[in-house]
Amino acid sequence: MPSVFFSYSHADEGLRDQLEKQLSMLKRQGVIETWHDRRIGAGEDIHRAIDDHINTDDIILLLVSADFIASDYCYDIEMQRAMERHHSGEAIVIPIILRACDWHHAPFGKLNAVPRDGKPITQWPDIDEAFLQVAKAVREAAGRVTRTASAPPARAAAAATPAASPAPQSLGPRSSNLRLAKSFTQRDKDQFRHDTFEYIARFFENSLKELGERNAGFEGVFRRVDANRFFATIYRDGKDVSRGTAYLGGETWGRGINYVHGETTSSNSSNESLNVEADDQTLFLTSMGMASFGRDRDQKLSQEGAAELLWAILIAPLQGTRY
């Protein structure tokens, strides 16, 4: 059975947990087995345990972020050894882009990264869809390993490598399912909501600017009213063709992030509303689905996904009319 090694920064442990959940079907089917440093037992030599797996596992997942690149251990030790084994054909290295960072110039920058086009997982509207693409890539890589199983095993080749450290004595079989449920306080949710509103504001401001630069005759105007509200307007040849207001909270909609057509300082109406929710691993946003007649209601939205949903409402009048 192909073995999978996670190389990641502990700053990204929450994302690693979510990825491991998406790989559950592969493990249940006996397609792969997984290992990461949280499986190192008490009393085991940490560096030897990692050395054993980085030198012998069949598939190495590089969970890439700015923290991963900044980590001397991840970048200089784990990644460098992984690339050596990849180039020698001993292992398959798959870069998984978790968060936006300058990764194209790294030694793994020429490898085909996932999700599709190397778009960071945290920027996908639906994070589950992004992790599903990763799971499919791991399944395909495991198939390649299985088909070449008649070749000399990677473990034997690695054992002959002088740089490889001796394997620690095994403490016996153990589950990789050691992930524990996380809990989020109301303070966590409030902070996430405010951070998301700031993200949406920046997203709209930049998108309105880019819209005008790309399309002759069009101008996008962003106006920040206060900490909890902004206006967005699109003009064509000086005539307003779409207006929207985004605001936090409100008299009717409670703690949500709300969007309403037109410009208003009132907080008692909404054409779409986003709420902060949590599962046992992460915070995310859900839509009331008012603008899409309920189609988007069940999606777990990232900050970018939430911003894209509201932006789609603002730009919809322009995309339905041929100018």
Swiss-Prot record:
Keywords: Plasmid. One of its GO terms (biological process) is signal transduction. Pfam families: TIR_2. Residues 1-142 form the TIR domain. This is Uncharacterized protein y4lF. It comes from Sinorhizobium fredii (strain NBRC 101917 / NGR234).
